[in-house]
Amino acid sequence: MVKSSLQRILNSHCFAREKEGDKRSATLHASRTMPLLSQHSRGGCSSESSRAALHCCSNLGPGPRWCSYVPHPPLKIPGGRGNSQRDHSLSASVLYSDERLNVTEEPTANDKTRVLSIQSRLTEAKQVTWRAVWNGGGLYIELPAGPSPEGSKDSFAALLEFAEEQLQADHVFICFPKNREDRAALLRTFSFLGFEIVRPGHPLVPKRPDACFMVYTLERED
């Protein structure tokens, strides 16, 4: 279960070098908002098919791609603001809220796909925000660019608990650009935590040769 990895996440060196005294903003964004891929989503994959597809990540061929909403490394939108950011939908609704997390959902054209903004409250004045996509039993999260922001380790642990306990997720995916300088450290750390590399051509991730995807399969007790 994911809880068995939470302490290792908190002790992970990828989250250990958080900046102290960062007063640039009361709100820390743990990931840049990513523009969506092409808008031709065909529908989600069932939990059962997801489990079967992920049984052996290293030996899968191409498959159907529903993933037009899946997170991926940011791109500049022609004619846009050029800062890889997009405004949160004014029609976003609250999906879940407790003393640590506030999760809002943005409407999409595909009723099987949910775009989530997950805000983790660290203090009364500071929070970390993750952008994620929920589809077919899988939660897709982009890791932040650059050094981990202060509080990201606790925020990520709370996010995984939310995926397991509230979403009842079958899989949690992370993605980041292949050209990141800390790519090797990320691969080592998340492999130690139980994440597996998702090979190119996997039917549950977008066709993005510039991005690396890893997956954690949540096992439930009977």
Curated annotation (Swiss-Prot):
Keyword NAD tagged: no
Name the record gives this protein: Ornithine decarboxylase antizyme 1
Sequence similarity: Belongs to the ODC antizyme family.
Subunit structure: Interacts with ODC1 and thereby sterically blocks ODC homodimerization. Forms a ternary complex with PSMB4 and OAZ1 before PSMB4 is incorporated into the 20S proteasome. Interacts with AZIN2; this interaction disrupts the interaction between the antizyme and ODC1. Interacts with FAM171A1.
Any single biological process term in GO: positive regulation of intracellular protein transport
Protein task: Ornithine decarboxylase (ODC) antizyme protein that negatively regulates ODC activity and intracellular polyamine biosynthesis and uptake in response to increased intracellular polyamine levels. Binds to ODC monomers, inhibiting the assembly of the functional ODC homodimer, and targets the monomers for ubiquitin-independent proteolytic destruction by the 26S proteasome. Triggers ODC degradation by inducing the exposure of a cryptic proteasome-interacting surface of ODC. Stabilizes AZIN2 by interfering with its ubiquitination.
Cellular-component GO terms for this entry: cytoplasm; nucleus
Domain of life: Eukaryota
Coiled coil start-end: none
Molecular function via GO: ornithine decarboxylase inhibitor activity
Keywords linked to the UniProt accession: Polyamine biosynthesis, Transport
